[in-house]
Amino acid sequence: GMRNDEILTVKETAALFKTTRQQVRKMIANEELPAVKVGREWRVLRAGIMEFFEENL
């Protein structure tokens, strides 16, 4: 199974990007970040964040 450190909450992702949770949700909606829905909460895949940074830096 997936270890906890491989997925981040929207809040943790926002902190990592130094942005707002609203912006993170927008990125998920735009499919800029790979995320999975867990109940009513989004979980962002850490691997996807690293990919995003590599493409955008």
Task: Walk through the language-model features, giving the residues of each.
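Major-groove DNA-recognition helix of helix-turn-helix-type DNA-binding domains
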Residues: 16-43
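Short helix-start
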Residues: 8-10, 34-57
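Polyanion-binding surface elements
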Residues: 1-23
